[in-house]
Amino acid sequence: MRYALLILCLMMVGPVTYAAKIKTTEELVHAMQKKYGKSWYKTATFVQKTTEHEKDGTLKVSTWYEALAVPGSLRIDFTPVKDGNGILFTDNKIYVFKNGKVDSNRPFVHPLMILGFDIYRLSQGDALEKLKGLKFDLSMLREDKWQGRSVYVVGAKQGDLRSLQFWIDKKNLYFVRMIRPTGKDGAQTQETQFNKYQRLGGGWMAPEVIFTVDGKTVTTEEYSDMRADVALDSKLFDPQYFGTVHWKE
């Protein structure tokens, strides 16, 4: 009798487990935050080799030093650092620096920061609002395959590789791909890939980032010397100190 009851209970578990599968973007964000919300690093630094693919076929290679404060801030110092040139993303703005001084700034929410990093350190409500503000259609979620792995796709139907959308690895719940229209009247398609993920602190980081337009690679980024939960001066992310405070000389 007990054995029969046990079998019956196990049979009942099947439908419950199936019902618990992720079926909405809200559930996906919740799962991502539940998995990493307490462990994901709050700061990180890395050295980036940036390769720009010029139209004439030549390659322009440069080194950037980058520092993250999650959520919300990313600092990029172009080499040589002493020249004071770079970019700062903070407080939903982008600042461009030349010779240590602000050359321009404007409102900007960085989609790759939100999807790749900030989503784990924002509240669920704030994360969803950011994604809505970026114009992703959160009502659309499906499953697909990418590079041999199962993924969730938010924002586009099966076979649509034009509309604004982002892809999340199903097992590890990290961001792997974004597609969006670009160029005049959205006639071109831009794709961003986060590849070759490695464990970093209590989270992950993709040491290879590829940007393409209409299937042609335009920029690649290769990260090295990746470090998590680094002690960083808050002034690193304050525009008024960009020219005087650095994490890497």
Where are these regions (language model features)?
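Sec-dependent N-terminal signal peptides
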Residues: 4-12
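Sec/Tat signal peptide C-region and signal peptidase I cleavage site
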Residues: 15-19
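Flexible, processing/modification-adjacent segments and terminal tails
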Residues: 20-30, 40, 95-162, 182-188, ...
